[in-house]
Amino acid sequence: MYSVCDVVRDAVAQSHLCACPNDKLPQCKGVTKAPPECSVFHVAKLQDTKFKWKYTLDPLKAQKLNQINKDIEKDAITLKLLYGIELSPEDLEWWKMQRCLINKKTGAKGGQFANKYLERQDLELLGYSPTPIIGGDFMFTALPDKVLRTIPIAWDRFLNPAMMIFFLIILLCVILGIFYVLVRNTLRRKQKIKQHQMEIKRFIKEKEQDPYIHTSFESWPADPNKEWKELIPVYEAQGYCMADYRKKLGMPPGPNC
């Protein structure tokens, strides 16, 4: 029973013939037709193209996606006849296929299409190009291999120049959204503070209408001698003369004196 990785490795083994027939390529001498295993690369390339068309506003989007699906179905039938198994096109994508490939240097499984497994440049010569990371193929000559190994091919989908503008727009919208929320909250806080200040001023203005304002009986602000003033009538009711205390507290003259 074949697995997806078996199919992928078969395709890699035949990849040097995938561009045939081509008189300019020495390996194509006498080859009249590309091996059916190359359908794996066809599907991967179509999946990449399909992914890009899904997120376009082009009026031909529906028509293009329909044609791509038909082409994928043709290659899927070819692979089914060859291996006798149903292969999901979603399993034949560049970033998934990398799990099945073998490191040319160490023999380890997994990694990305760049200087390590089935070379990205080799695929381009054959007419199949995995979506390059941001910066395009220039990055593969400008950066050392150790750096490239840290970039999983899964990110190829999202860090390529064609898709980067899409994510930059999303990032810009997020930044603008955060800025809008911060400005809105700041304005709301200022509005609340201003409203509270207006309420305090209105409250003070109402209090200033007290008929006893600026007298010893004013109700605002609170009188610190209030308790003593309340005790004086109590003592006077018992017959004491509280004239001196009334004078000190600013109270009018009372009885018993």
Curated annotation (Swiss-Prot):
KW Hydrolase (keyword) present? no
Q: What induces it?
A: Expressed in the late phase of the viral replicative cycle.
**For this UniProt entry, which segments traverse the membrane?**
123-143, 163-183
Q: What superkingdom does the record give? A: Viruses
Report whether Coiled coil shows up as a keyword of the record. Answer: no
Give GO cellular component annotations, separated by semicolons: host cell membrane; membrane; virion component
Instruction: Tell me which UniProt keywords the record has, alphabetically.
Output: Host membrane, Late protein, Membrane, Transmembrane, Transmembrane helix, Virion
Q: What is its main location?
A: host cell
| Record's subcellular location | Host membrane; Virion
| Topological type in the membrane | Multi-pass membrane protein
Family classification: Belongs to the asfivirus C257R family.
Name used for this protein in its record: Transmembrane protein C257L
Q: Which organism is it from?
A: African swine fever virus (isolate Tick/South Africa/Pretoriuskop Pr4/1996)
